[in-house]
Amino acid sequence: MRVLYTGADGYIGAVLGPKLLSSGHDAVGIDTGLYRRGWLFDDGCTRPMVISKDTRQLTTTDLTGIDAVVHLAELSNDPLGENDPGMTMEINHEGSVAFAKKCKDAGVQRFVYASSCSIYGASGDELKTETSLVDPRTAYAKCKVLVERDVRAMADSRFTPVFLRNATAFGASPRQRFDLVLNNLSGFAYTSGTVRVMSDGSPLRPLVHIDDICQAIVCALEAPREAVWGEAFNVGDETQNYAVRDIANIVNETFAGSVLTFGPAGADDRSYRVSFAKIKEHLPSFCCKWDARLGALQLKSVFERIQLDEKVFNAAPFTRLAELRHLRDTEQLDPRLRWTPMKDMFPAVAAE
């Protein structure tokens, strides 16, 4: 199967590419390069060719001959979305729907979209299934709901959209992110000797390792059409519905000698538990191989190997919002997050 995947140089994309190749697929990546500075370590894996291009600029001609698309490239996570809700809506909702339409027009048969369990919002102890009411609290989560709605409406006998509602990701990637809860707490523990939870640790968060997300993507690509046509799947495992305090305790135990601290109850009311029964029923080859404890151990091993320090841990390329702010503040990106050509930054030099 010829597979195009967007966000190829991102946190998940850097792990997905080798997974697609090892699964026997002819893969090609697309990435505009917003986070290319964030390379933490070399995993030695062979990767598909990655074309440097903004997904918004792709045409139906570019997509001709592609059997399936995996769409990862969006402005990721809630804090980033709230920083500029209008831009988030333009890129994540309008941009993703327009891209899906181009895929359909080009003859792409399967469209796997990376959605999120964050659409469930604040549900407390209720176990959320794919048919539960959604309660998106942020621009990022609202966009996920809207994309699912609008792309599902495109489904027909020739076009099969699939929506993977990923739990909160964790784990090591060459394109590392430190703005995800387990990764962040682990980085703090290793570099500063503290596990700092800004809230009281009571919010509930389902977690899923990026390797397991990539496995779910491959399963969604390879499944019979009738098993996935227009379907949404929560991606994770019910044993990994954690309270944030439980995640913090696991990190504290993994990084011996670290000091665990909690803050007051925060204003963020997002808290949800999720059922993952449906994905096991429809995609029986999928199962999570990682849990939070194994993920913390993996991160510790990586940190020890590369001798992670506070400077690297706190560097902008490993935190989505900080890196985008840097690129905009230095005028490398325009207000619509498109790269500013060097000739526009140095007109006198370009004129020579």
Where are these regions (language model features)?
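N-terminal Rossmann/SDR dinucleotide-binding element
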Residues: 1-68
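Conserved catalytic-core motifs of eukaryotic protein kinase domains, centered on the activation segment
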Residues: 39-41, 79-86, 122-126, 174-175
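Glycine-rich NAD(P)-binding loop of the Rossmann-fold in SDR/ketoreductase-type enzymes
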Residues: 87-98, 134, 138, 142-143, ...
